[in-house]
Amino acid sequence: VRLLVVLGHQNCGAIKQAVKEYDALLHNLTASAEDSLMAADSVADLDERIMNADSIMLRTVGFSIWQAHESELESNEDFERVHIARTIEQLVEHSESIQQALASDRLMIVGARYQLDSGKVEVLSF
């Protein structure tokens, strides 16, 4: 294999569900805080709370939502793009064979997003 395509798609249900769960987690953290300093402390360890969430959707996709918010991105389309990029990062980080193939120029990885309404494929560059 010389080319690996990580293809996401418009209106992704996993992204939508993760956004709901992320927003609920954030709301619960800030609503239970008695003041703004406590709220800031609660949000400061948000990555740990996502990593230890009961929901597999939040554990797997929630980091993409969190990263997008950290970059001040707010749309589902942007969340989808960030999740594609994060998926590529995870593949490279956790696969020694992919790392070796990339290092020796035997493999290219491309991120893309299929637009359901138009049938077009948006190629993403990272």
List the predicted regions and their residue ranges:
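Conserved functional hotspot residues or short segments at active or partner-binding sites
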Residues: 6
